[in-house]
Amino acid sequence: MEQPVIKEGTLALIDTFAYLFRSYYMSAKNKPLTNDKGFPTGLLTGLVGMVKKFYKDRKNMPFIVFALESQTKTKRAEKLGEYKQNRKDAPKEMLLQIPIALEWLQKMGFTCVEVGGFEADDVIASLATLSPYKTRIYSKDKDFNQLLSDKIALFDGKTEFLAKDCVEKYGILPSQFTDYQGIVGDSSDNYKGVKGIGSKNAKELLQRLGSLEKIYENLDLAKNLLSPKMYQALIQDKGSAFLSKELATLERGCIKEFDFLSCAFPSENPLLKIKDELKEYGFISTLRDLENSPFIVENVPILNSTPILDNTPALDNAPKKSRMIVLESAEPLSMFLEKLENPNARVFMRLVLDKDKKILALAFLLQDQGYFLPLEEALFSPFSLEFLQNAFSQMLQHACIIGHDLKPLLSFLKAKYQVPLENIRIQDTQILAFLKNPEKVGFDEVLKEYLKEDLIPHEKIKDFKTKSKAEKSELLSMELNALKRLCEYFEKGGLEEDLLTLARDIETPFVKVLMGMEFQGFKIDAPYFKRLEQEFKNELNVLERQILDLIGVDFNLNSPKQLGEVLYDKLGLPKNKSHSTDEKNLLKILDKHPSIPLILEYRELNKLFNTYTTPLLRLKDKDDKIHTTFIQTGTATGRLSSHSPNLQNIPVRSPKGLLIRKGFIASSKEYCLLGVDYSQIELRLLAHFSQDKDLMEAFLKGRDIHLETSKALFGEDLAKEKRSIAKSINFGLVYGMGSKKLSETLSIPLSEAKSYIEAYFKRFPSIKDYLNGMREEILKTSKAFTLLGRYRVFDFTGVNDYVKGNYLREGVNAIFQGSASDLLKLGMLKVSERFKNNPSVRLLLQVHDELIFEIEEKNAPELQQEIQRILNDEVYPLRVPLETSAFIAKRWNELKG
């Protein structure tokens, strides 16, 4: 079939499942995405995002094909039974979405191609070979290197990989790539190649001898290029090498002919064709974007389409550049420092990182002049360490430093150059963005949302590190000017005045508190953790053997799929709808088989082992301290989060979890730990906001609030017996809990839960009036406000009653959780200010409503009393008193009475 020649645009070949799987696992890093009905949507979200991106770039891909995997056994799997068998089983949550995703692709009008017995890679190879057009393969699979030519390129979504790039990266031609794979193997596909020969020696062999066949034809020459051990492996693994090459070789003839005109990119937005499905699965924001779109392209030839511009923003947001000076001598840097004598100087600054977060440089902008300081080279020449220490100190002393996520930059300057941070002036646009909408804080997404600019930050550019200084400078110039415009946007009306004040008085000073905690670190008992690591490992082995013996078959205990098959199919235990083996479902069949309690015990221990015991030993510094990273803008409610490691999620209620906490200790014998915990902070906020007389009186007189509630609901005689129910109701209300959730929490009938809540509101009508009023206010304003005026935004446009109910519950929760966060921040600021430059008190950690300090043991009672006084009396004038409990100990696990 004769094909037309297209002079512009390309044929896009999509490695469909690879794209979707990657987006699914990215979305599942923190918490898997689900819709309001609990159905998993991470993979579908990736599909929708992919289609949005492709539609935006449709003029560059007039023809598009989605390549699919064969549903039958592939040729490679027939050749090698172990082929890809080392890969983990796909999560059931993901598998549920695949048929839906394929159906959506078909409905949207895309061409999907599957060939029985062949992988999607083979489909792509065949179509790329047949194609008369320039062809772009959308994938990160390195096997496609063998196809690269002047007509075929590989694209990972950001960077194009050409034939010359294959030569540069691997030192071989694309035509030699299967030979290369034959030698080095591929661990992801589970074929081994030649054991012990890596990329360096494989490259030398192929550069010298040309192909795998030539290598084995000229073993005497190959012998001179290898160590004796490698040469012996080459001889022994000949069969493996040729099998590996065969497996790596993509089939270019599984499709003999193809009508490329039939795979034109759909002329209208493909998502319009699945509006009903998007609604069904809860893609509300996508539907809203479709409805609010100022234009819909219909029946427009893609190759001749003209870009349609958005409305011009209020600010002048056209991308601007500044002249950049690469600082390679002391003179221009000294001249820059002289300009800082202006007391109103503002320096816009970006920490320059590579994709692995390694620091490469600093870029900064003063007025309209940009500067690029390569730090890797600058450490040696022409700048001395002392010169840079002085330069950075002057910079932070004289100018207001403005950045987006400044804490890593400031921490770097303090750690590397000992720059004092006590009296610095800063403005962080990430904090301003967080106050405007806590759901969107990333630099690129904030620029897109508020300035309507598409800018890829340098750290997301794959080859940024290898670019020339001139290229880096130009990219950073764009970033710095975008940062400047973003700051102007927030300061000139983009953010309410009271939130700017909140940023200045609370959130910005809080950055310094967090840096102090991070630098201080929390010491661990390293020998204890080494012993615990071995104990956990031994116990895991024993548990695993016990479980397998009880079940009577060997299988991978860490595979939910295999566990489900064993429990539900082999043992015939009662099944749930999804065959899930999560904790909730295993608890339902706890008494059905003696292995179930052991499986739950194994899982808890395995999580502790992999999350804490081993990682903590790896992450400790030379002083055996753990330095976590606190995220100020990571949660919608304003609560702190931490990572690397997450010290806020160390279990407290289980004996094994307490063993982890036991390993955290005071840094020396002169110090001890102090834990100060706010008592019932959300309920005190409920009393403050609702002004309920009975609730306020109970707190003012120091009564047991849960017992008082129980008396009001059940009478004096049953009060103690029913206290736990009253406690669940008290806390449930501030978390937006309804009768259904209460019935699940207490394991009681729904009707009984409803009667408890009705009785509660009848007894405390002012609380009911307050909560109803808050819901009405959230519906009216689409915002839920905290004590200090932060807010969370909810968009009720076009949502159904179910979603609206969820939003209102989240809104009520945001008021109390967010206000509790406000109080904790105020308390941490007050204590930090009181003990500034005083080594007798060091703030280490915040966990929920608790603060962990390290204090001098000789003055421990007095210091405890002073810290509690500040936290109780100086934080905020609520209508009821704030109250804390405190404990002193040498180890973290002992901080509860």
From Swiss-Prot:
It is an enzyme of class 2 (transferase). The keyword Secreted does not apply. Residues 498-896 are annotated as: Polymerase. It holds the Pfam family 5_3_exonuc_N. Its EC number is 2.7.7.7. PANTHER family: DNA POLYMERASE I, DNA POLYMERASE NU. This is DNA polymerase I. It comes from Helicobacter pylori (strain J99 / ATCC 700824) (Campylobacter pylori J99).
